[in-house]
Amino acid sequence: MIERGKYQSLTMVNWNGFFARTFDIDGLVTTLSGGNGAGKSTTMAAFITALIPDQSLLHFRNTTEAGSSQASRDKGLYGKLQPGACYAALDVVNSRNQRLLFAVKLQQVAGRDKKVDIKPFVIQGLPSHVKPTDVLIESVSATQARVRQINEVKESVAQYEGVQFKSFSSIVDYHAQMFEFGVIPKKLRNSSDRSKFYRLIEASLYGGISSAITRSLRDYLLPQNGGVKKAFQDMESALRENRMTLEAIKTTQADRDLFKHLITESTNYVAADYMRHANERHKKLEQSLSLRSELFSSRETLIEQNRLLNQVQQELEMLVESESALEQDYQGASDHLQLVQNALRQQEKIERYQEDLEELNERLEEQSMVVEEAQERVLMAEEQSTVAENEVDSLKTQLADYQQALDVQQTRALQYQQAVQALEKAKVLLSDSTLTAESAQALVAQLTQSEAEQTQALLALKHKLDMSSAAAQQFENALKLVHSIAGQVERAEASRYAKAAIQQARSAQQVVQNENQWRAQHRDLERSLNQQNQAQALVAEYQKAHQVTLDDEVMFEQERERHHAQLDSLEIALEENRELRSEQRRQEQDLQSDITQLQAIAPKWIAANDALEKLREQSGAELADSQSVMSQMQQVLEQEKQLSQAKDKLAERRSQLESEIERLASPGGSNDPRLKGLADTLGGVLLSEIYDDITIDDAPYFSAMYGPARHAIVVSDLSGIEEKLVELDDCPEDLYIIEGDVDAFDDSSIKAEELEGAVCVRLNDRQMRYSRFPVIPLFGRAAREQRLELLRSEREEVVEKHAKAAFDAQKMQRLFQAFNQFVAEHIQVAFAADPEQALVIARDKRNQLTRTLAELEAKEQQMRSQIQNSKQALTMLDKLAPMMAVISDDTIGERFAELEEKIAQLADAKQFLNAHAKAVEQLESQLAVLDADPEQFDALEAQYQSADSQLQALKKQIFALSDLVERRHYFAYADSVDLLSKSSELSEQLKAKLVEAERTRSRYRDELKQQQEQMNQYNQVLASLKSSYQAKLETVQEFKQELAEFGVSADEGALERAIRRRDELHERLHTSRSRKSEYERTLTSTELGMKELAKRLKKVQKEYVELRTFVVAAKAGWCSVLRLARENDVERRLHKRELAYLSAGELRSMSDKSLGALRLAVANNDDLRDALRLSEDNARPERKVLFYIAVYQHLRERIRQDIIHTDDPVEAIEEMEVELARLTEELTMRENRLAISSESVASIIKKTIQREQNRIRMLNQGLSNISFGQVKGVRLNVKVRESHEVLLNGLATQQEQHKDLFETARYTFSEAMAKLFQRVNPHIDMGQRSPQVLGEELLDYRNYLELSIEVNRGSDGWLQAESGALSTGEAIGTGQSILLMVVQSWEEESRRLRSKDIVPCRLLFLDEAARLDAKSISTLFELCDRLDMQLLIAAPENISPEKGTTYKLVRKVFKDHEHVHVVGLRGFGQEQKPKSEAQQMIEEFEA
């Protein structure tokens, strides 16, 4: 690692108080400690004077004068010196371990100004053991010494081998030497640099934040950059070249823009209107066809609806008439039903009352029987009670009279015997041995009934016999009854006829009894017959509707199955039709989507096709597919590359020629423009200028003789040239300098020998140079002019070839660009199928699908109608289903006729009964009279005798049985027989019997009483029943009378017939009303539809007539427009197919926009302006075509035939584009130089700014952790001024926007920069500065930056570093940090100027360090240690010498002589740094 150079010591000779004092400078901090006036400031002044020996800058003052503008006249230096020679010397060891003694000799100059003469010098290579005082002071004796003069010093130094002494006549040279050896951080080229350095040292010395430095931080921290000036020169040259090209481009652009603008706008203006008329004509034709189709269809629909309306009206009239009759019938049926229902209710009442009567009659009979039984029981009870009473009385009598009792018992025994006899007699008469007394009573009843029958028969015979014998009149009456019934009959037949009449009456009764059954059958058959008639009507209606006759149930089932199958098939077909329609609609939507897509693609395809055709014309290739386009594009690219390479070679050759011409045209013909400046700097003349007048024949010789030195600089004296050459910053690698008289140059010093075609030059005894004559000599003006003439001729030829090659290359490049643009924009669609043909096909398919959809809808409507018919048929069949059983039954009529006959018989029977019922009833009672014919009396008498004998025998039996029954009580007297034999026991038995008899009597009395009470109750019930029966009977008679008044038949059949008729009429009426409502709705809707249709028909007819008139009228105008366009060959330019897909509004908008642009474009051309004004008449579209033709004719006249070889303005635009591209390319090449120059200006400034920002950021890192009092850090902020940043952006990226500044001859580049700055920052006042001055300032990047210093102080954070905001110690520490940053910046800036193995010394000062506290001083020590810096401070006596080296200064006065006593002390807290290997080797060598 390279070590930093260090100050080793400061030697002061003959200063006030210091005759010969050397202060060793510590590697860290050197402290000068002492009281006031001890000499601390003097010591520092000596150091600074040796460092900056410029009296115009040196001004040593104390801190009280820090802000004073006026100070002592000697500026603090004169008074610090003793008379005579004085020295201040700095002993330095640099990074190369070279010992250097930089010193200044100072001597007071007598006079009022108190000036000091300063002469700097340097001693290099002084041995380490030799002290500076050894060469500056000469010892006269052991106690006396003398200050040597500078010459003596030089002589003294000369005694040391290798030691060099060098004095300097200028401070610049002195500082250049110091910079070269790494003593100062910056190269001080002039007084400004020295002033900056001195200000830094002064600020360091007095401490604090120097306003002089902080205000000029940019000058201190930011180095200059000469690259901008170079960029400025490049830009100025590029601007000059640009202006000529720009004028040519502007001319071509003006023509191109005029052609392009007029063609584009006129084409848009006329073509938009042209295509709008074409589209409108096409649309009007389609619209007229559509209106005509609609008109015809509307007429047919109107006729159909009118026919339907008339039919509906007729049916409605018929329906209204039938509905009125139906309403009357329905009302009558409702009234009849009401009567039948009332009659039925009355009949129900009668029947209910009759039932009650029958029930009352039954109850009455039952009650009568109950009463009779009760009477019998009462009689029996009375009889038993009487018997019991008699028995008791008898027993009492018998007990009272025993003989009587005995007689009674005898009587009873006799009665018992008679009863037994009677039983035996009865058994004999009846021949029944099982007969008993108990069974005799039942048998008596049977025989009594037989007796009654036989008695009746006997009485009848007796009656007949009596009648026959005594009542002939009765026979006549009965015969009359027979005659009234059967008419005149024979007397013998009267009985037969009477019986027949009675039989007929009985038959009639039976017929009447069958009335209900027959009526029910009649109702059923009538219902069946009605069903049959209704079914036949439905069959007829079905046959009328479906042309099918339903003969039987088989046919019915077949028809039902057919309709079900038809329904299923229709449903399936309807679903298929619906799916098919959905599919057709989907296809229609797809087609519509395809049409929309094709319409969207069509303009792109048309544009692509046009571009493809244009490419085919330009390239001459077929370009059948994309592959051929790509291959042709590759061929064009290769051709363009070949042409571009040829053009580039020509351009390169042109550049070479121009460079050579420029070089040859320069003074001396030097190929390096820097030589002229160097010649001026060195005070010489170019050798080529001296030989400028030689002849062309001598030019080869002299050119070969001087060889590489032909561009040498001739100077009058070589002394001092080396020093000047060292100061050169920029010079050629080889620079030849020849000493000679410029006015009378002599080449005799060159030992040259001319050979054949060459020159041999002997440089010295060991070197020689052989140079052949150049083929093209350039030495001398004559040779250069000859060469220039040839080069210029060649350049013209090359320029012409380059222009042609550039034109061809540009044309090929435009062709490649056209290919490239085609590939980028159109290749995807160019080779696709023609969308217009696809559109025609798609539209045809869509129309076909529309027709198919209409057919499908009609078919669906038809199927729905068939489905409806089938459903109606099935409904009719469902109605017919229950009736089909009767429709084929032919017997219903016969049975109904038979029942009608029976009903008629019933009527006859009722009529017979009504007529002869009473007669038959009388006749039936007198029928026997007719049988008893007087002629038959004997037979009747014999029959009577026989019947009487039988009756008598029966009576005997009954008598015997009755006697037995009467004597049945006597069987209880069986014991009386025994009592007769036991008379003794008779009394006791009688008493017992009496008791039993009394008990029996009591029981019989109770029973009698109960039976009498019960009979009374039964009699009461019987009386109430008779009363109820009578009342019910009267009510029934009244109800029958009321029922007779109704005049209707009150039976279930009548009600059912009435309800059925009422319901049938109601259904028919409801159906009629529904049909009427439907007809009325149909009528209303049809009338409304006809009105709307008629209105629409009128409107359509009117529109059609108007549209047809318009179409016919427009056709003639369109034909004239079309003929005019074809005759003038503009149809292909006006008929833009892509415009056909735009709406009329879009086309009109396009035309209007173009019209506005054309008005401005042709404002200065009377002919075109008049033509445009005439073309604005929309009623005359041909005038727009005439305007387009006029524009074309005008443009043909404007074509520049010198550069364009066509009469077509469109092709002329293409050629102008090529020419413009060629000129633009030239401009671009120059603009690239301009852009590169301008961009380089901005780039250099930006990069420099960025580099400096990074460098300052690195500097900040070293100061971020320092601490002085409350200050915890120091940093430097750098930012670009906003106004200048806008300028940089405008300069770098907005060149096109600011061309008017940089491409005009009115402004230089600096002025253009100033104008640009004013343009982008209009708010900034420029003051009195001229644009040139401002522009030069803007070329300095440092003016773009703003620098500020901030400190991190306490709770305030980062704030601006100002002395007023900081304490004294904080300000001093901050100031030292800032100065250290400046020093570091200078070192970085000057690194490229010095040797890489040199690291400069770094030292600062600080006077009156007592203003810092111990912590701040410690921070300074640490800062010096960290940054490898040396610090020289003057401190009071209270500074502790812990680190560094401390010198104790005490000024002592001895008589008239002052002396500063110095005691040196190295800090005890300082660590000894390890010595480097070089230092150890030097110490060992010196030892």
Curated annotation (Swiss-Prot):
Task: Give the keywords, sorted.
Answer: ATP-binding, Cell cycle, Cell division, Chromosome partition, Coiled coil, Cytoplasm, DNA condensation, DNA-binding, Nucleotide-binding
Localization, UniProt: Cytoplasm, Nucleoid
Magnesium among keywords? no
List, alphabetically, the GO terms of the cellular component aspect.
Answer: cytoplasm; nucleoid
Name the Pfam families on file: MukB (PF04310), MukB_hinge (PF16330), SbcC_Walker_B (PF13558)
Supply the InterPro entries for this chain.
Answer: MukB, MukB/SMC, MukB_hinge, MukB_hinge_sf, MukB_N_dom, P-loop_NTPase
- Gene Ontology terms describing biological process: cell division; chromosome condensation; chromosome segregation; DNA replication
Provide the GO MF annotations for this entry: ATP binding; DNA binding
| Binding-site residues for ATP, renumbered to this chain | G34, G35, N36, G37, A38, G39, K40, S41
Which intervals of the chain are annotated as region Flexible hinge? 667-784
| Subunit architecture | Homodimerization via its hinge domain. Binds to DNA via its C-terminal region. Interacts, and probably forms a ternary complex, with MukE and MukF via its C-terminal region. The complex formation is stimulated by calcium or magnesium. Interacts with tubulin-related protein FtsZ.
Q: What is known of its domains?
A: The hinge domain, which separates the large intramolecular coiled coil regions, allows the homodimerization, forming a V-shaped homodimer.
Q: What is this protein called?
A: Chromosome partition protein MukB
